[in-house]
């Protein structure tokens, strides 16, 4: 899906409704949560007459330094007069509390996203910019263009999304505009130390989890990968979402693609693809997933498919190497 819509379109829809319900995606991360709560805080501060709801569950993520006080789902009568907003996601099966969307009660829906994938949302307007490093960067753009008042809470949430999805401003889609908008947050009440210290904080249990993942490290061809089953995750006192850490093994010399395979409670296995060049999205799409060129994901049913995915990734490395030589 090509870039579509604009901040003006998003602003028009947000201005139009006095009741707004904001969703995040399943297996939440810093970008979807930062975008969701950043937008809620910005709207509440700048439009105090509006009722703005953030629904879902952060699954304990980032609660050590930021507050995620989710709202109750409004009544059906309220939903009928509301704008539903999906940030950082597209398909309903990727959206937390999709059952609310499945009712098709919203007057309209708005999608704010940087993933180049089609959606199946009802009565939807889309603002999609694939080159953005994070959906939170788009929320920052909206705040900048609308000259909204930015509280410390709002700035911290939005900065969380930008920092985590950009890998601390290291990933390839980080742009001059990313830095300009981060600077704008610095000028408008951001507490960067709170965010960075919160993200850096670890525990003995975290170190044990990292050790378990590192002990599973394998290589095949030019692909490095780690994997862990659900039983081992629980034995470590963790939940599956805590163990999705592909960048632990990122950028090992000679391995331009790195993967993590993480079994969830359902028995399904979450696959995270990362690279510093090859287009891993091609492999993710083959396996029913999607995402960005160098950061994608999919779900598989069995660890028996691990070697097949690794083989596909090695083929993608070879294809990429041929391209850069031409």
Locate each region found by the language model.
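Generic enzyme active-site microenvironment
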Residues: 23, 27, 86, 111, ...
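Hydrophobic helix-and-loop "lid/oligomerization" segment in the mid-to-C-terminal part
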Residues: 2-24, 34-65, 74-82, 164-286, ...
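Glycine-rich, phosphate-binding/catalytic loops in enzymes
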Residues: 38-40, 101-104, 127-128, 180
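Short glycine-rich anion-binding loops that position phosphate/pyrophosphate groups of nucleotides
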Residues: 27-28, 89-92, 115-117, 230-233, ...
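Short N-terminal binding/cap micro-motifs at the start of the first secondary-structure element
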Residues: 29-33
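Active-site cofactor/cluster-binding pocket
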Residues: 64-125
């Amino acid at each position: 899906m090509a870039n579509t819509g604009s901040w003006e379109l998003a602003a028009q829809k947000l201005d139009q409704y006095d009741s707004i319900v904001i969703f995040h995606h399943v297996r939440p991360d810093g970008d979807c949560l930062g975008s969701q709560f950043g937008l809620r805080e910005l709207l509440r501060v700048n439009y105090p007459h509006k009722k703005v709801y953030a629904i879902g569950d952060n699954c304990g993520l980032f609660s050590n330094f930021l507050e995620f006080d989710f709202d109750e789902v409004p009544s059906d009568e309220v939903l009928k007069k509301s704008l539903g907003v999906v940030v950082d996601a597209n398909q309903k099966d990727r959206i937390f509390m999709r059952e609310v969307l499945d009712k098709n009660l919203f007057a309209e829906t708005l999608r704010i996203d940087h993933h180049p994938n089609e959606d199946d949302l009802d009565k939807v307007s889309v603002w999609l910019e694939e080159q953005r490093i994070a959906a939170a960067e788009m929320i920052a753009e909206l705040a900048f263009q609308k000259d909204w008042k930015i509280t410390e809470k709002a700035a911290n949430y939005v900065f969380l999304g930008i920092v985590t999805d950009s890998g601390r401003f290291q990933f390839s889609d980080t742009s001059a505009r990313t830095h300009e908008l981060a600077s704008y947050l610095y000028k408008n009440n951001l507490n960067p130390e709170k965010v960075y210290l919160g993200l850096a904080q670890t525990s003995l249990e975290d170190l044990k989890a990292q050790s378990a993942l590192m002990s599973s490290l394998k290589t095949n061809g030019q692909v490095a990968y780690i994997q862990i089953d659900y039983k081992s995750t629980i034995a470590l006192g963790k939940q599956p979402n805590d163990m999705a850490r592909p960048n632990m093994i990122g950028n090992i010399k000679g391995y331009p693609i790195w993967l993590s395979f993480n079994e969830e409670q359902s028995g399904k296995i979450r696959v995270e693809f990362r690279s510093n060049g090859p287009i891993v999205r091609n492999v993710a799409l083959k396996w029913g997933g999607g995402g960005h060129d160098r950061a994608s994901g999919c779900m598989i049913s069995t660890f028996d498919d691990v070697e097949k995915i690794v083989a596909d990734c090695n083929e993608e490395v070879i294809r990429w190497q041929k391209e850069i030589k031409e």
